[in-house]
Amino acid sequence: ALETSNGIHFVAIGGDEHGNIHGNFGWVTIEGEAVDITYVADE
């Protein structure tokens, strides 16, 4: 996990039985809205 001083965070979770990597990252916009992205890297 990584979090920067300006509020960006990133987490990568190890592969599953198919070798896919799961993770998420996010930040807070200038307007104060939280943005969170969750992904599966499968290729």
Swiss-Prot record:
Functional description taken from the UniProt entry: Component of the cuticle of the larva of flesh fly.
Organism: Sarcophaga bullata (Grey flesh fly)
Keyword Amino-acid biosynthesis: no
One GO MF term: structural constituent of cuticle
Domain Chitin-binding type R&R as annotated: residue spans: 1-43
Keywords recorded for this protein, A-Z: Cuticle
Protein's name according to its UniProt entry: Larval cuticle protein SC1
Alphabetical list of InterPro entries matching this protein: Insect_cuticle
